[in-house]
Amino acid sequence: MKCLIIDVVSPAIAEELGKYMDVTTCEQLPPSKDELKAGIGDVDVLIMRVDPKIDKEVLDAAKNLKVIGVCSVGLNHIDTKYAEEKGVQVFNAPGLNGNAVAELTICKMLEQSRHTIPAHRDVTVNEKWDKYAFVGRELRGKTLGVLGFGRIGQRVGEIARVFGMKIVAYDPYLPAEIFAKNEATSMSIAEVCKVSDYITIHMPLNDETRNLFNAQSIAEMKNDAVVLNMARGGIVNEKDMCEALKAGKIGGYATDVLENEVAGDGLTADAGFRSPLFDCDNFVVSPHIGAQTTDASRDIGAHIINKVKEALNLK
C-alpha cells in the first residue's frame, strides 16, 4: 500500500503509517491540483489539510484510494458525496484543535482591544513613543456574542468569562441546557449583533452560512463592535466588511481566514487573492493558523493514525 502526505502534518503520521505502507511526502506542500492528480493514481491513503480541493477530477484520478485523512475540522474542500460513492472513507479531526482556535480568538480579541500591532509598528517603523495614541478598552464588563456555540464557541466563552465578559450566543441546533451549562444567553443572530461588543464566528461554511455576515448584519451592530472570524472566510462578505470599516460603522475585524485563500509565497495581487480588506484600518489577518500549535498537531496526528488503521484493519 501507498500513503501520500500533501501538507505539513504531525511527523508521527509518517512514522507510524510507515510501518504498514510506503509513505511519500510531496516536495511542494501543498501541491497544486494538477500535481496531485498526476501523483495520486496508485495511492491508497491521502493525508491532507485543506488544499487543494478534492473534487470529482481528483477522485477519478485516484484509482486505488481508500482513505482520506484530513488533519483539520472542515470538509467543504472535499466532495464527500462523490468520495462515498467511490468507496473512499473520509476522516477529519473535530474538536482536537478547539483549544488552539479558542486561544487564538482570545488573542485577537485582546489585540483589537489594546491595539498592540499598530503600537508596535509605530515604535519600530515610525520611531515614536506615543502611548496616548493607542488608548484601548478592557474586556471586563463587555458582551461577547458567539455565532456557533459548538466545542470551540463554548471554549471561547469559558475563557472570556474569566475576563469578566457576559456571553450571548446563537446556535439553533443546541438544546437550552447547553446554553445554561455554559452560562450563556441564547439569542437570534439579530439580537446577538445588537447587544454585543465583540462577535466571534465559529460556524461551518455551507449554503446556510455563506455571506451570513453582510451589510445588513453589520448595520445592526454597535459602531465600535469588533468581529472575530476563526471559521471560514466565505461567512463574512469582505466587500461589505471593508465598506463598513472605511465608513466607521464597525470597530474592527480580526480574522484567521479569507474568502479566497491560496498557497504561495506572499500576499500579492498577482497571487489572485488580494482582499479589499488589506487596505482597511482596524483590520488584522493571519494565514489560517488557528490549529497551528504543536499540541493540536500531536493530538490530531494520533487521531488520524487511529482512524486510518481502523479503516484498513491494520494491527
Q: In which residue ranges do the predicted regions lie?
A:
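Short beta->alpha connector loops at strand-helix junctions that form conserved
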Residues: 26-29, 71-72, 88-99, 171, ...
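Rossmann-like dinucleotide-binding domain for NAD(H)/NADP(H)
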Residues: 90, 224, 232-315
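Phosphate-binding beta-alpha-beta segment of Rossmann-like dinucleotide-binding domains, i.e.
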Residues: 86-88, 94-143, 158, 162
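Rossmann-like dinucleotide/phosphate-binding beta-alpha-beta segment
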Residues: 19, 132-223
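Short glycine-/small-residue-rich Rossmann-like dinucleotide-binding loops
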Residues: 51, 73, 197, 203-205, ...
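Glycine-rich nucleotide-phosphate-binding loops and adjacent flexible coil segments
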Residues: 228
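An anion/phosphate-binding loop that grips the pyrophosphate of nucleotide cofactors and donors
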Residues: 43, 62, 195-196, 224
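An N-terminal-biased, well-structured beta-alpha scaffold segment characteristic
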Residues: 1-91, 214
